[in-house]
Regions:
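Conserved class I S-adenosyl-L-methionine
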Residues: 44-54, 72
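Conserved beta-strand signature within the Rossmann-like core of class I S-adenosyl-L-methionine
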Residues: 148-155
Length: 211
């Protein structure tokens, strides 16, 4: 029985890898990244922050779409995702010919920036991987967002991970945030319902709004 479970687990991981591979037929990761990046809009001279940038894919895609703005991708990198690094991000940016992006080691739980440092904050499938209070992580990212700045955060916003997100959205609105909403992305927007169910990302959504 144990061997059977192990085989099924390996098969699931292989199928997941093929689905998300940039070189595969479906290229789901690329589709999601471009979907998030398409909602990232910065004014000329604006500053954008990508929290938990990993390989730099979202930072680079967003920077390409906003050539007159500057993007910063931050991540802890390290053992959990050993294949990702600051050097890899920089290499990927060079390969894409993108010069308006740079990368820095930083922790999403305590970002090394003053309040209201950025015009936009974005992220893709990051906070659910960090143990602890995920709403507090969101608050930390919003702390560095300037008044009038936009946030575009994509993650798995299930109740057991994030708690009551409707109450969180209401609290933001009560504080003066505008156009705050959760947009489901696993209903065909980024991911097919059938894919999302077996990948266990059915609660994927974009958290967007203006501070």
């Amino acid at each position: 029985a144990g061997a059977g479970i192990g085989f099924l687990g390996s098969a699931w991981l292989l199928a997941l890898y093929r689905l998300f591979s940039y070189n595969g037929k479906r290229q789901l990761a690329r589709h999601i990244i471009e979907g998030v990046a398409s909602r990232v809009q910065l004014p000329e001279g604006g500053r954008g922050l990508d929290v938990g940038c990993g390989s730099g894919a979202l930072s680079i895609a967003a920077a390409k779409r906003n050539p007159k703005a500057a993007f910063l991708g931050v991540d802890r990198w390290g053992q959990d995702y050993a294949s990702f690094s600051q050097a890899l991000c920089e290499d990927n940016a060079r390969a894409e010919g993108v010069r308006n992006v740079r990368f820095l080691r930083a922790d999403a739980r305590q970002l090394p920036f003053p309040d209201e440092s950025f015009d936009l904050v974005t992220s893709n499938y990051v906070y659910h991987n960090i143990p602890g209070d995920r709403q507090a992580l969101l608050r930390e990212s919003l702390r560095v967002l300037r008044k009038g700045g936009r946030f575009v955060i994509h993650d798995i916003f299930s109740r057991h991970i994030y708690g009551d997100m409707q109450a969180f959205l209401q609290s933001l609105q009560d504080e003066g945030y505008t156009e705050v909403r959760l947009i489901p992305t696993a209903d065909g927007l980024f991911v097919k319902r059938s894919e999302a169910k077996w990948m266990m990302i059915a609660d994927s959504a974009l958290l967007i709004g203006i501070k």
